[in-house]
């Protein structure tokens, strides 16, 4: 159902002004905006516009300078399929039962919930997927999404478009940046990693992917300008989840759910705006639907980013469930200062076996070696423990890297109680199943460590040529050891 867009345009203008994202007055005849939604795969806020010194991302920086940069933006899940399922529907993945990554049991969405592109298509938008880049959608449901084109150039005259594109360079198939290689000695590592040459080089290689992605994003934005579409197009740039490094993707720490969020809309969003509100990716869905003048059949879970309501938000929520064949479950609630994590399966290691991570994360191999050698610091060894604490609490102002669990401290107990209550309320509202008996039977929790010290050392050596390859040098990641994995049987740890 279409809303009266003329009234909505004026409403949005007023809300934007109250939100300090200034707008120029628009008449009731103002056309509905085009929407270009760009997703970076598997990377967080390690961009120069967010303060990272070693990386060079001029096109993304320019986008930030021409619009608004959000400093507290989050996904609802720390992995692509569940995060994208939420973004494609405007509803938390646990509410729509799309919360299991790489599930074999995909179903139709609950009654009344329909994909955002389909709603926009029905409202008269040309809905384009890919636009020359990745067409990844990766949803955990069977409904048709409603994309009607491959590029915004296929729209009819005067037809507004919604385009979703994915820049997949940052996914773990990393190339080297031949034009602007990053010196590993210039990067800043999180304190939960040991400072080793291989980890430094792995981190620098990741930052180079952002530089490569930046070049592609620059071409997309230039194409928008060349087509004369800049002024009436809302451009949104986000990450689909956090960085693909240990303690990042697949986990509810900041490294897994904190993402960049930049928006540009000339004449509506004031340039060089920085917003510290708590926002998540569902808010983008709500904003888009409102701007398009669409009334969804089921109320969306997000808030309009241009509303006063969002400034009053106290908490954001995130959840992690099955990752490939790895069974684990965690829930998190975050305020502006604190994060509370509830580990629903604390008896399982953070680093229980996961083929994807063991296959693609050189840093994880180093962590396993040093953990078994006993050479990690306490803040580094926490993530390698054989069990998790049932609860975690972090003061993000004092401890932005989340290395000091305050759950048993006396001072923040009122905060803990409030966060527990908020999380439980959210779980109830989402009809969150938590951990079922069937789910608990999955995975390989007893197989930890997943390999012997000798085996992990051999894997580090195999990763070495790939990680340290020179720009332009063609060396594939060492997949040959994965066939050996499954696993070191606990009775045969000497292998």
Model-derived features with residue positions:
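A glycine-rich phosphate-binding loop feature that marks nucleotide/adenosyl-phosphate handling sites
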Residues: 439-444
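Extracellular, beta-strand-rich glycan-interacting domains
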Residues: 396-398
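Formylglycine-dependent sulfatase
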Residues: 2-391, 400-421, 428, 434-435, ...
């Amino acid at each position: 159902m279409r809303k009266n867009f003329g009234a909505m345009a004026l409403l949005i203008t007023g809300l934007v002004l109250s939100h300090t994202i200034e707008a120029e007055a628009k008449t009731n005849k103002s056309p509905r905006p085009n929407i270009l939604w760009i997703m970076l795969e598997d990377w967080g806020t390690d961009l120069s516009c967010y303060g990272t010194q070693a990386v060079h991302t001029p096109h993304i920086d320019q986008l930030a300078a021409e619009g608004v940069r959000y400093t507290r933006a989050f996904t609802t899940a720390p992995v692509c399929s569940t995060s994208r399922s939420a973004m494609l529907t405007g509803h938390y993945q646990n509410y729509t039962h799309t919360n299991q990554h790489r599930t074999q049991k995909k179903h139709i969405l609950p009654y009344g919930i329909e994909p955002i592109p389909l709603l926009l298509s029905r409202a008269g938008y040309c809905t384009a997927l890919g636009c020359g880049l990745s067409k990844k959608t990766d949803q955990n449901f069977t409904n048709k999404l409603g994309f009607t084109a491959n590029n915004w150039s296929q729209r009819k005259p005067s037809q507004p478009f919604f385009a979703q594109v994915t820049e997949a360079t940052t996914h773990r198939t990393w190339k080297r940046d031949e034009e602007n290689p990053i010196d590993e000695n210039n990067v800043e590592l999180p304190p939960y990693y040991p400072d080793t040459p291989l980890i430094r080089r792995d981190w620098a290689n990741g930052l180079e992917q952002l530089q490569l992605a930046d070049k592609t994003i620059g071409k997309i934005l230039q194409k928008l300008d060349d087509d004369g579409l800049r002024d009436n197009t809302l451009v949104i740039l986000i990450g689909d989840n956090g960085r693909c490094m240990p303690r990042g993707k697949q986990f509810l720490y900041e490294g897994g759910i904190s993402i960049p969020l930049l928006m540009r809309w000339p004449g509506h969003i004031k340039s060089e705006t920085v917003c510290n509100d708590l926002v998540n990716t569902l808010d983008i869905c709500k904003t888009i639907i409102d701007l398009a003048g669409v009334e969804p059949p089921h109320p969306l879970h997000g808030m309009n980013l241009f509303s006063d309501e969002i400034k009053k938000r106290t908490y954001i929520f995130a959840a992690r469930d099955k990752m490939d064949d790895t069974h684990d479950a965690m829930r998190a609630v975050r305020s502006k200062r604190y994060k509370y994590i509830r580990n629903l399966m604390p008896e399982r290691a953070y680093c229980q076996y996961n083929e994807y991570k063991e296959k693609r994360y050189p840093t994880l191999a180093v962590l396993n070696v040093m953990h078994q050698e006993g050479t990690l610091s306490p803040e580094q060894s926490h993530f390698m423990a054989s069990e998790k604490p049932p609860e975690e609490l972090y003061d993000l102002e004092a401890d932005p890297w989340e290395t000091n669990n305050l759950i048993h401290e006396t001072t923040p107990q009122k905060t803990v109680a409030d966060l527990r209550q908020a999380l439980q309320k959210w779980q109830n509202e989402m009809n969150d199943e938590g951990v079922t008996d069937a789910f608990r039977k999955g995975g390989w929790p007893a197989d930890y460590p997943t390999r012997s010290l000798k085996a992990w050392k051999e894997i580090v050596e195999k990763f070495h040529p790939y990680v340290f390859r020179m720009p332009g040098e063609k060396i594939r990641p060492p997949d040959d050891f994965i066939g050996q994995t499954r696993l070191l049987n606990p009775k045969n740890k000497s292998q």
